[in-house]
Amino acid sequence: MVGPFAARWRAGALAIVIVPVVVAVTRALVRGWGPIGDNGILVVRADDVLTRHHPLLGSWTSASIASGQAVHNPGPLYFDMIAAPVKLFGHSVGLALGVALVNVAAVVFAVLVAERVAGRTSMVAMAAAVVVVEWSVGSELLFDVWQPNALMLPGIAFMVATWAIAAGRLSFLPWVIGIGSLLVQTHLSYVYLVPLATISAIAIAVAGNRGANATMPWRRPLAGAAVVALFAWAQPLFEQFTSSGQGNITSLLDASNQDSQRLG
């Protein structure tokens, strides 16, 4: 049972990280905000979810320049996550609400995990750090679907989840795989960070347990992580093996090799 005093602290910490996003979205929509440029293309792809144009991949990536063929970010998870608000409320309101909901979920997750891993002081510190980020980037970035901006707060959630694993909380492994998959699929800039952070967190957890007599409970977290990974990557894998031409994963590897050869 959580006492009323602890509950008030938690409610306050959650409120201060949620309010900036809510205020930013509300103010923008009242002023008639709408997606333009790349954001307009991204919202159309979100609206395509569960239609005959359903996206199996992410958006076009500049890796296409190196490979000489159309290459996309690895997967459509972000489109899937914001599709419902876009379809229900339209391209302007729905897009802003969809991105805002993802960001709210990310910051709430970060704050609650910090409390679970290290207590109230950690929760308050995490909330303060998130608020600093939210206020420093500017209000419009808090509901911007352009990938480098849209993944900023989910990226924080991912790092908090890896910290939890490093602290021995293996039950967060499925969360790391799920959020990490979202990051990698949405923008290639995370393709090295996510595996490196995940492996490092697991290594730290194993090293920290060497002196303990109890065996770490790996079975259930690994099983959960495998299920999450299969679900998260089902669409890109389907595209890879059913594409009439070269699959996107192969194209990404080719583009990476060509970039390496040019740099060499």
Please state what every model-predicted region is.
Residues 76-80, 88-105, 141-145:
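Loop-to-helix entry region of an early transmembrane alpha helix in multi-pass inner-membrane enzymes
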Residues 41-49, 63-91:
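Short hydrophobic/aromatic helix or loop-helix immediately within or flanking a transmembrane segment
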Residues 1-26, 206-229:
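Start-transfer (signal-anchor) and selected internal transmembrane alpha helices
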Residues 97-119, 157:
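Transmembrane-helix motifs of polytopic, lipid-linked glycan transferases
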Residues 159, 173-200, 228:
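Membrane-interface alpha helices of multi-pass inner-membrane proteins
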Residues 45-48, 52, 209, 220-264:
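Transmembrane-lumen/periplasm boundary regions of multi-pass, lipid-linked membrane glycan transferases
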